Every structure is written in C-alpha cells, then in structure tokens.
Amino acid sequence: MYDYIKGTVTTITPEYIVVEAGQIGYQIITGNPFSFQRLEGTEAQVFLYQHVREDNISLFGFQTTEERYLFKKLLSVSGIGPKSALAIIASGDVVPLISAIESEDDVYLTKFPSVGKKTARQIILDLKGKLADVVASEIVYVAPENDMVAGLSPQLEEAVLALEALGYSTRELKKVIPKLSKEEDLTSDAYIKLALQLMTK
C-alpha cells in the first residue's frame, strides 16, 4: 500500500498525471489533473490510494490527505465507485460537500456526476456524523456575532462555530453545549465528534 509519492510531474492529461520517481513514471488518476499544471516539471508530493481489481491496479492521487480521507469514505457508500468518488472530490471544495451531507441536502449532492436521488440519500445515511476529521481541518473559523459561544473554552468555541458553519441550527447547538461543556480538556476535533454523536442519537 502506497501512502504518497514524491517526484517530478512530467505529464498532465485530462484524466491523469505522470509522476517520475526513481526513473519510473507512475500514472496517477486525479479528479482534476490540470490543478497540477503549476507543478509540471517540478517535484511534487501526491497522496495516493491504490485500487486493486482482478484485471487492473490503479493509483488515485490527491493534493491533500483530507481529500483522500473523504474519497475513502465515499468509497464505503453503496453504489459509489472510485470514478464517482473522484468526480465528487473534483469539485475542489470539501466544506460545501460535507455541509450538504450534514444538513441532508440531497438536492446539492445530485449535482455531481452519477449521483441520483437514491445514491444521494445513501451518502447521507452512511456518512452523516462521520466526517468530523475533515471538518476540523478544513473549516475556517470566524469570530462569533452572537453570545452562543460566550464563556466557552477556545477548543469548544471552535467546534461550535464549525458545526454552525455546517448548517446546524442555534437551537440544536444550544441543546448539546451544556453536555459538551462538562467534558474538559478535549480538542476541537473531539468536541465535534462528540457533538455529532449527541445530535444523531
């Protein structure tokens, strides 16, 4: 199993890039190969996912570990294959995607190739509440304009603002904040996970 490759980006096509490392050219399928254009001819690090079938071994490439994590989560959904998962990731911004999953916005999800109403509902069913790791690393936190987070620890404040950005209502958050406040010394990521568990019970 490969984790990443470091080498020179030598070729960019509409479907894949080629990275040369150790005098071997690796063909790597990516959601948006042309996003690597600025790296052509230079050394780049590409995070990998190796997909093995009876008749084929493919390498899928990502610019961040968060993209790869989400790709693997999408693969766990019934009806989503590697190419469909990659097409979803290729939108380039994972935050609206995660927000749609958390808010059960199946209309937003059906805009992606090969995702119909049934598949969109399956994505929500399988992944809602399970993407806190990506949320914690991708969301840019904004200073609050209300008193909902007043008096909270910095870690809990970050978690609450992240959940608010994902579309959770003030009412939903106020229900779980007292329970979260009882848990001390948690990271923002841990608070997000706990909050999602409480709200999905």
Swiss-Prot record:
Q: Where is this region: Domain III?
A: 153-201
Q: Which GO terms describe its molecular function?
A: ATP binding; four-way junction DNA binding; four-way junction helicase activity
Q: Where in the cell is it found?
A: Cytoplasm
A biological process term (GO) from this entry: DNA repair
**Which InterPro entries did the record assign?**
DNA_helicase_Holl-junc_RuvA_I, Hlx-hairpin-Hlx_DNA-bd_motif, NA-bd_OB-fold, RuvA, RuvA_2-like, RuvA_C, RuvA_C_sf
| Residue ranges, annotated region (Domain II) | 64-142
Q: Name one Pfam family in it.
A: HHH_5
Which keywords does the record carry? Cytoplasm, DNA damage, DNA recombination, DNA repair, DNA-binding
Q: Where is this region: Domain I?
A: 1-63
Q: What segment(s) does the record annotate as region Flexible linker?
A: 143-153
Its main localization is cytoplasm
Q: Output the Gene Ontology cellular-component terms.
A: cytoplasm; Holliday junction helicase complex; Holliday junction resolvase complex
Family, as annotated: Belongs to the RuvA family.
What does the annotation say about its assembly with partners? Homotetramer. Forms an RuvA(8)-RuvB(12)-Holliday junction (HJ) complex. HJ DNA is sandwiched between 2 RuvA tetramers; dsDNA enters through RuvA and exits via RuvB. An RuvB hexamer assembles on each DNA strand where it exits the tetramer. Each RuvB hexamer is contacted by two RuvA subunits (via domain III) on 2 adjacent RuvB subunits; this complex drives branch migration. In the full resolvosome a probable DNA-RuvA(4)-RuvB(12)-RuvC(2) complex forms which resolves the HJ.
Q: What does this protein do?
A: The RuvA-RuvB-RuvC complex processes Holliday junction (HJ) DNA during genetic recombination and DNA repair, while the RuvA-RuvB complex plays an important role in the rescue of blocked DNA replication forks via replication fork reversal (RFR). RuvA specifically binds to HJ cruciform DNA, conferring on it an open structure. The RuvB hexamer acts as an ATP-dependent pump, pulling dsDNA into and through the RuvAB complex. HJ branch migration allows RuvC to scan DNA until it finds its consensus sequence, where it cleaves and resolves the cruciform DNA.
Name the record gives this protein: Holliday junction branch migration complex subunit RuvA
Organism in which the protein naturally occurs: Listeria monocytogenes serotype 4b (strain CLIP80459)
